[in-house]
Amino acid sequence: MDLMNTQLGKEYTVLQIDAEDPELETFLFSLGCYSGEPITVIARRKSSCTVAIKDGRYNIDSGLAGAIRVEDR
């Protein structure tokens, strides 16, 4: 499933990033968002969501959130 279809406040594990743009993958990697890392959706809006990755919180748009594939921890 992708981040836009997760439960709020529940921790998931990143499976893969399905971004067509390698720069997006590099950007997410710089935030600590890569395969095997825990991620939690804190808040969701129509066009974006706020996620907790490691010690940071980030607001990402729905397109990017849809490219992040996760599984239950």
Regions found by a protein language model. Give the residues of each.
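Conserved hydrophobic positions within beta-strands
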Residues: V14, I39-V41
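C-terminal structural segments of small proteins and small subunits
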Residues: R45-R73
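Absolute protein N-terminus
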Residues: M1-D2
